Design a protein with these regions (language model features):
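Alpha-helical context
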Residues: 36-43, 74, 111-114, 118, ...
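Short, local alpha-helical segments
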Residues: 44-47, 78-80, 119-128
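Acidic-and-aromatic substrate-binding clefts and catalytic sites of carbohydrate-active enzymes
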Residues: 51-56, 82-89
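C-terminal regions of proteins
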Residues: 86-170, 178-192
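Active-site segments of SGNH/GDSL-like serine hydrolases
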Residues: 61-87
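N-terminal start-of-chain detector that recognizes signal peptides
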Residues: 46-48, 76-78, 98, 153
Length: 196
């Protein structure tokens, strides 16, 4: 309904993931080392609002009501991508609803410069998803945002979080490989294929 992955249902490994019985080596993260350049959208930070479809607004308001009733915190995030002006205005509309209910709304499309995102290099599929280098930049930005606005307990070194430390060690090794691959693809002008 919101972000479909229905084609993945053909993979037996995904059925184990759905029931949370299969541990993922990177805690759900998938490395993308492709490069699919896209011009930087000129609508990041644009003003104005456009209403979202009524059924989506109803779902958003239901979620906000649930969070309020349960006394839960929530952070609504839009990751950077090759958005249109219409989409930016819809995010502005959603942001007003979310913040009016007392929750934070972080639209990373308003922070390209602070993130350091380079649309010609940091996307895997022509503006929809970041590659590993772009994801690292977004993660660094999000980390700083979270540390500025929330309080966390450092759980590194605790036995219960050992699997996270192991995943992070694996991630660091894979990330180095991805950086080299991405830089090589950019240098050679080898870009991702568009699959219809």
């Amino acid at each position: 309904k919101y972000h479909t992955n229905w084609k993945m249902l053909a993979l037996p490994s995904e059925w184990a993931n759905m029931a949370y019985r299969k541990a993922h080596p990177y805690k759900g993260y998938t490395f993308k080392d492709e490069v699919g350049p896209q011009p930087m959208p000129d609508c990041g930070g644009a003003e104005g609002q456009r209403a979202i479809p009524p059924e989506q607004e109803a779902c958003l308001r239901d979620l906000l009501s649930f969070l309020q009733e349960e006394g839960k915190e929530g952070l609504f995030i839009v990751s950077p991508y090759g958005e249109s002006l219409e989409e930016q205005q819809m995010y502005n509309y959603m942001e007003e609803i979310v913040t009016a209910c007392g929750y934070r709304f972080l639209n990373m499309n308003n922070h390209y410069e602070e993130i350091g995102i380079v649309f010609e290099e940091d996307f895997a599929d022509y503006g929809s998803h970041t590659n590993a280098v772009g994801a690292e930049k977004c993660t660094d930005f999000l980390r700083e945002y979270l540390l500025e606005h929330y309080t966390f307990t450092d759980k590194r070194g605790e036995d219960a979080y050992q699997s996270w430390e192991e995943s992070y060690d694996r991630w660091k090794t894979e990330m180095e490989t991805a950086r080299v691959t991405i830089a090589d693809r950019i240098a050679r002008g080898e870009y991702a294929e568009i699959v219809e």
